[in-house]
Amino acid sequence: MPKYVIRMAGETAKPGWIANVNPFVVVCCVSFITRLMSKRSAITSMNVGMFLIPISALLMACGNLLGNDLITGMSNITLMMIAGIVVQALAECFISPRYLEYFSLQAPKGEEGMYLGFSHLHSFLSSIFGFGLAGILLTKYCPDPALFETREAWEAASGNAHYIWYYFAAIGLIAAVALLLFAKITESIDKKKKV
């Protein structure tokens, strides 16, 4: 994200402060959202959050699709990055508080600890594949301006930089649908076991 913002919004962009938007929104909203979803199942809360993730990525993609800056003194790239991060933080508020609860409910009695340990496998895999994919996409759609002789040549090469976010929106949508299917399948299996 920092390289994308600096390359698209310019060297004067300061993406460091944008990273603070996520924890700010989470701290402000997690209690309210947790209370709001308290009567719902953990999987329902998680699914709401999972379907917010692709919306977040699509908002981030809108940054260089908009015309003139919407807010004076702030590039649309920065504005839409903030909007996307806000939605992503809201998704986190729906997912995180109920995530471990859901995994512990899936575990057979006495194996909760092992299941909770494996619940973090996604973080490990996403850090490997996500960072690699981000680097490949950044190189393809938003290359380093230093590699070009003119600003115009770089602008032509990075004209579709927003495509990066479409990949992440697609991954988020696939993950949301996969979680929904997983919940339906495990619910069906659990019903058969009770019969």
Residue ranges of predicted features:
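Loop-to-transmembrane helix entry
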Residues: 3-27, 48, 79-82, 159-166
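Multi-pass alpha-helical transporter architecture, strongest
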Residues: 62-64, 158-195
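A membrane-interface helix-boundary motif in multi-pass transporters
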Residues: 136-173
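C-terminal ends and interior cores of transmembrane alpha-helices
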Residues: 51-73
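Loop-to-transmembrane helix entry/capping segments in MFS-fold secondary transporters
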Residues: 12-13, 78-79, 104-122
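Hydrophobic core of transmembrane alpha-helices in multi-pass small-molecule transporters
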Residues: 70-95
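Helix-to-loop junctions at the C-terminal end of transmembrane segments
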Residues: 28-48
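Intracellular juxtamembrane helix-capping segments at the cytosolic ends
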Residues: 5, 93-108
